[in-house]
Amino acid sequence: MSRPVRTTAAVVALALAAALAGVPQSTAAPSATPSATPRANHVLETRVLGESVRGRPITAWHMDNRADGKRKGPTVVLIATMHGNEGAPRQILRSLRGGQAIHGVDLWLVPAYNPDGLAAHTRRNAHGVDLNRNYPYHWVDLDGNYESGSRPGSEPETRAMMRFLGDVRPDYVLSFHQPLHGVDTDNKRPAFSRRVAHALGLPATTLDCGGVCHGTMTGWFNHHFKGFALTVEYGARPGSQRMREDAPPQVLKIFDAFRSAKPPKQELIPPP
């Protein structure tokens, strides 16, 4: 049943304050299992940001660039699978986590932001909420495929990400999606957006949400922080080679970052 649109400044303010209260604690990396995949030993921190509706951990990996004495570079957060049926770009983040040492950027990776949706191969989380309509910025009450939740910041995944971004305060956030095939340039930093599009081989365009772009993560972040969050849309079937081999160095190039040429020591860890 359709519900009337409702926005409440007080509710939004309370949701923001509640979500940013407290700092998430770091946890040790999980132990290896027989189904583990190779990962380079270049992870500085493994942080559990929170849990999904079904109790699955939402994990971020902080890549270690301390060996690069020249410059730390910008702080960058890469996020994949906000929508669980848009899983291909997750391979980009897993490749960055598992390859050679990364220099010139302070990099955080969140490969599985919506682990319940990923497991079920659904856009929304286990409550049936579109996480990219649940943020307390221009939130409205939406139904159907874009169900926005009972209130702004109602979902544990949303609150976990809000706390994390409020703690890290990155210079840049790239949120990877499918299948619209383009990078939105209708934002506060169009020149940087065009740079991203060029580096990734995607069209620079205006992504029209059809009138339902309310409560988005990028909108919330860009309103509250000095940094810049950008949505990157790959196509429906970008191809495994593009995701695993081509895109990771392209992403680093955006920030003038690079990898070591020497193969790293590797260990086995479970995939996210």
Identify the meaning behind each predicted range.
Residues 54-63:
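A short loop-to-beta-strand scaffold at the N-terminal edge of the catalytic core in hydrolase folds
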Residues 63-66, 225:
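Active-site beta-strand termini and strand-to-loop segments that position acidic
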